[in-house]
Amino acid sequence: MNRVDTRPPERRTQTISDGELGALVEGRHRDPFAILGPHRDGDTLIVRACVPGAHSVMLADSRGEPLAPMTPLHAGGVFTGRLPAGVSVYQLLVRWHNGTQQVSHDPYAFGLLLGELDLHLIAEGRHFELGACLGAQWRNVDGVQGVRFAVWAPNARRVSVIGDFNGWQPARHPMRLRHPSGVWELFIPEAMGARPGCRYKFDLLDPHDAQLPDKADPLALATEAPPATASVVTQPQVSAPPFAWQDDEWMRLRNAVDPYAAPLSIYEVHVGSWLRAANDPARGWEVLADRLIPYVHELGFTHIELLPVTEHPFGGSWGYQPLSLYAPTARLGPPQAFAAFIDRCHRDGIGVILDWVPAHFPTDPHGLARFDGTALYEHEDPREGFHQDWNTLIYNLGRNEVRGFLLAGALHWLEHFHVDGLRVDAVASMLYRDYSRAPDQWVPNRFGGRENLEAVAFLRELNTVVHERCPGALTIAEESTAWPGVTASAASGGLGFDFKWNMGWMHDTLRYLSLDPIHRAWHHQDMTFGTVYAWSEAFVLPLSHDEVVHGKGSMLRKCPGDDWQRFAGLRAYYGFMWAHPGKKLLFMGGELAQWQEWNHDAELDWALLDHPMHRGVHTLVRDLNALYRELPALHELDHSPAGFQWVVGDDHQNSVFAWLRRPAPGSGDVVLAVTNMTPVPRYGYRIGVPSEGCWHERLNTDAACYGGSNLGNGGAVTAEPVPSHGQEASVLLTLPPLATVILQHAGTQA
């Protein structure tokens, strides 16, 4: 075994005081390597070991054969012995009171574990492989297999690793502090029980020698299923055996796609309540792979967006209060099963986006809160570090190590799990120091302003690093204010996201949808205002989980009128949305037209598919996705004003909207979309179009197959050379009640 010898010579042979021995067995000694392990004494090595509960300990050779006895130094389990001259490689042969024995290499015989470059990058916040550096790493060190534990806790007086392998006794495995990085490290051989599958935590003393709650590993790659809170040793990464990726073709093609010109239709999913049978730590991801992936494929969505799957203690947070930012929740299975789920999505042509939460974290005592007895990950001042709305703590993004922890965590999902994008949660709460705070409850930035400059710098760095290291991966911001340049490049002063949720469009149009049709004439602008700023950012139109909880009502319940009008209004609204500029997002259950709000403790009301009206909405969503993907006009120029033109935007008396969608020049036909948001059919309604000839009725939300009255235009209309609405030609349409009709011009490309 090769060792790096770092102990000062004068420390090796002096007598160990009773006070130091007592501190060692009580788990209070700050420098265990100064006492434990091999220490040179002339031509031989003195070895000390702390093995509480042992009957006896002997020094053994590499085969486990006894070399020399060890005698007790302290009743708490400290033993000492001398190796024969010329012998430096040894093992500890421990006999327990129950008659069993254990032979293992000594954790305190190994030299420094982490390299100086690793520690330097950690301190700079630029170690982008942090998940393979800190935490519990299944490694071979000097020919010995075991687990290398490392944790950042610069202000702790002592850190021990505790777990299944040592009876959860802090005195067994105190760790070495690496100055000045504040990282503690220790290698525990497999022969001592440290191996994949074993549970562990860190036991810490704060700067004043006070005991802290046992802490889960911030860099854990796997965890116990809640309510249990321990971290779990796992294989090094999912990119290594036993999992083999089969999505090379997907990853290659993804990197070549222009996300702004491509269709992007997202099905947002809370996995625990999509199907209750998936809540199985043994095979949850397998169940979802068998059920969710074919379902999404049938409906034609391009991507699945998962509410946070990072491990979180409280299920009622829906994942938005995570503690283990590197571990997929154990509620659904091990990390390899999650990787297999993503791999299968890719092989079926479906991308995967994860909701990711870098804004805040919960106060659970086993988590990041006052991790080493100080405000390590959070701000010390509660005006900066405590979020009053959610009773959570706010990351201190001005600290290099915290920023690096989050950056590496984002890359962990993109690089090691092949995730296709991150939807960053609660960006607005990060950008403003006074977000949801009273005037005297926030701290201005160094210029006296309300902008959180550290958060701005972090988000720019996040997007820059993601786009440099993960070509084709998307970043999407949930940002609810008018912060400028969210999707502008970081180099030009923007934040650098690929897309931003259009919360304004969502709020305006849902408010309009909830009105009785007789009142809609006075709120016409709610449906048109979105196009005033539609190209100021690259937008996703989100009908998310937040809009169907907390008394807001399901999508169907938002619609006024009798049952027929509710279904018709919802179908018309979906048609309006899919034909409107912007990428699409629909939360699960919206395609079923559920009556009830989303309940995270239940599952979707799948029995609704046995009812024709609900099945009709389901079929409509499928057909909208198919048409959206087929027609370039509906997606290619989503983020350019050249792709959109109002034809009828001011008919508030009839609540009719009509607009043209155009593709990139030469790539497809012009599309006309018309929405009638009253229950009154409109016959002979003239609408201007840019070209004469045949306009095919590609989709009518009032079709009988969707549960409608089947009023329409017989599949096609012919444009006449009658100018109207500033266009050279026009069509006379029958507008069904509460319906959207989408027509495609035949033969003349944009």
Swiss-Prot record:
Q: Which CDD domains match?
A: AmyAc_Glg_BE (cd11322), E_set_GBE_prok_N (cd02855)
A biological process (GO) of this protein is: glycogen biosynthetic process
Keyword Heme (UniProt): no
Tell me the GO molecular function terms.
1,4-alpha-glucan branching enzyme activity; cation binding; hydrolase activity, hydrolyzing O-glycosyl compounds
A Pfam family annotated for this chain is GlgB_N
Name the chemical reaction catalysed here.
Transfers a segment of a (1->4)-alpha-D-glucan chain to a primary hydroxy group in a similar glucan chain
The record's EC number reads 2.4.1.18
Q: A single GO CC term, please?
A: cytosol
| Functional pathway | Glycan biosynthesis; glycogen biosynthesis
Q: Which domain of life is it from?
A: Bacteria
What keyword terms does UniProt attach to this protein? Carbohydrate metabolism, Glycogen biosynthesis, Glycogen metabolism, Glycosyltransferase, Transferase
InterPro entries in UniProt:
A-amylase/branching_C (IPR006048), Branching_enzy (IPR037439), GlgB (IPR006407), GlgB_N (IPR054169), GlgB_N_E_set_prok (IPR044143), Glyco_hydro_13_cat_dom (IPR006047), Glyco_hydro_13_N (IPR004193), Glyco_hydro_b (IPR013780)
Family, similarity comment: Belongs to the glycosyl hydrolase 13 family. GlgB subfamily.
Protein function? Catalyzes the formation of the alpha-1,6-glucosidic linkages in glycogen by scission of a 1,4-alpha-linked oligosaccharide from growing alpha-1,4-glucan chains and the subsequent attachment of the oligosaccharide to the alpha-1,6 position.
| Quaternary context | Monomer.
Tell me the protein's name.
Answer: 1,4-alpha-glucan branching enzyme GlgB
Q: Which organism is it from?
A: Cupriavidus pinatubonensis (strain JMP 134 / LMG 1197) (Cupriavidus necator (strain JMP 134))
